[in-house]
Amino acid sequence: MSEEVPQQFPSSKRQLHPSLSSMKPPLVAPGEYHRFDAAETRGGGAVADQVVSDAIVIKSTLKRKTDLVNQIVEVNELNTGVLQTPVSGKGGKAKKTSRSAKSNKSGTLASGSNAGSPGNNFAQAGTCRYDSSLGLLTKKFINLIKQAEDGILDLNKAADTLEVQKRRIYDITNVLEGIGLIEKTLKNRIQWKGLDVSKPGETIESIANLQDEVQNLAAEEARLDDQIRESQERLTSLSEDENNKRLLFVTENDIKNLPCFQNKTLIAVKAPHGTTLEVPDPDEAGGYQRRYRIILRSTMGPIDVYLVSQFEESFEDIPQADEPSNVPDEPSNVPDVPSNLPSTSGLPENHDVSMPMKEESTERNMETQEVDDTQRVYSDIESHDFVDGIMKIVPPDLDMGVDYWFRSEVGEVSITDMWPDESGPDWNQMITFDQDHAGPSDNKILEQPQTPSSPTPEESTATRSPTGS
């Protein structure tokens, strides 16, 4: 039987049964096929031929199975060769394979892997690469920091624990140190200083604590809102009640008794929105006396100024009308004037030098005039018109267009001197008008601007003699 099979093997290709010519793969192993034919019950010759044909079919199937086994063995050898460590360059160069051979091997690998899941080999290769990635290594390194005592980690122990080279650990530490998350305490020792690294259980507890804190803050905010609403309702009822409107005021003593206003001059200003307030330096002029000024400017409406309280020593340095000036006399070319000439102003004989003046200085004359204006305002405040209570301060009727404070710092030249106004006010007429209505204390203030230059003896005699009669 075994000798006849090789002799008839070449003719088996022509004698294949029609049922075996189908391209569908067998459902079971070829050895398990069994045919029951009606010719089997007939003559023995027919049965022998059928057995021979069955034997031929089985032989061809066994050959295909053998080829499949050989392919599986080649696939296993290829897998083991890929995962092995590459040979060093000293041992010899590996044989170069063509691209077609590589493609055939890859195709064989894919066909052999179909016995299991389709992507097992690719998943294994990707998993191995991810295991050695820097991202996963960084996560493991952070976990080591969490588990370290006092947050200090030894890099040598970390390299041994993670089973990687130290240069990989140094790559991670350099990046974390660059962004300020860790710091080096000692050699090969690092400490976490960035965001709070807490354990999983601590994170859950912190979330619960934060939620409780948010609820407490919300309750506190609601309580404060209720208190604010109640206070606003009380203020509204207090201000809108007709019985309380007559009590909505403060007295002068209420203001003066405040500790912050003790021994101070208090001035109340009622001005519209956008009013500018300037307080020049009292020592800016550099004169022998200090001048205090408050400059208010508004383009939206009138300004009202009230004197609430006046400190007694506020104007102590200003010379009074009956006090001689302590300023030394300035040398001048004025000849001696007889002392027996009458003086109607009631001032001492040296009243001509009560205000220092220069003959050829327009700026000094303007400063003297402004000092006189300041003294006039002070004299008005100290006059008999000052009564108990709050007094309204009215500025003097002078030319408010005269520029004094807006002056140039270079050369001390004022803008008024640079552009003189020829059609300015006639000071002689203003002085004559003021002389008719001013008291004895105002004569001194008004007589000083009349001497911008050194007068001659004849002019002084002519000026004084009519008033002495």
Curated annotation (Swiss-Prot):
SMART domains: E2F_TDP (SM01372). One of its GO terms (biological process) is regulation of transcription by RNA polymerase II. The keyword Transcription applies. Its main location: cytoplasm. Residues 403-419 are annotated as: Retinoblastoma protein binding. One of its GO terms (molecular function) is DNA-binding transcription factor activity. Residues 1-28, 84-118, 319-374, 426-469 are annotated as: Disordered. Residues 129-194 bind DNA. Residues 8-22, 100-118 have a biased composition (Polar residues). Expressed in proliferating cells and several differentiated tissues. Detected in inflorescence and shoot apical meristems, cotyledonary vascular tissues, leaf primordia, young leaves, base of trichomes, central cylinder and elongation zone of roots, lateral root primordia, flowers, pistils of immature flowers and pollen grains. The keyword Transferase does not apply. It comes from the Eukaryota. Keywords: Activator, Cell cycle, Coiled coil, Cytoplasm, DNA-binding, Nucleus, Transcription, Transcription regulation. It is found in: Cytoplasm; Nucleus. SUPFAM superfamilies: E2F-DP heterodimerization region, Winged helix' DNA-binding domain. InterPro entries: E2F, E2F-DP_heterodim, E2F_CC-MB, E2F_WHTH_DNA-bd_dom, WH-like_DNA-bd_sf, WH_DNA-bd_sf. Residues 447-469 have a biased composition (Low complexity). Residues 349-374 have a biased composition (Basic and acidic residues). Residues 202-246 form a coiled coil. Transcription activator that binds DNA cooperatively with DP proteins through the E2 recognition site, 5'-TTTC[CG]CGC-3' found in the promoter region of a number of genes whose products are involved in cell cycle regulation or in DNA replication. The binding of retinoblastoma-related proteins represses transactivation. Involved in the control of cell-cycle progression from G1 to S phase and from G2 to M phase. Stimulates cell proliferation and delays differentiation. Represses cell enlargement and endoreduplication in auxin-free conditions. This is Transcription factor E2FB. It comes from Arabidopsis thaliana. The gene is E2FB.
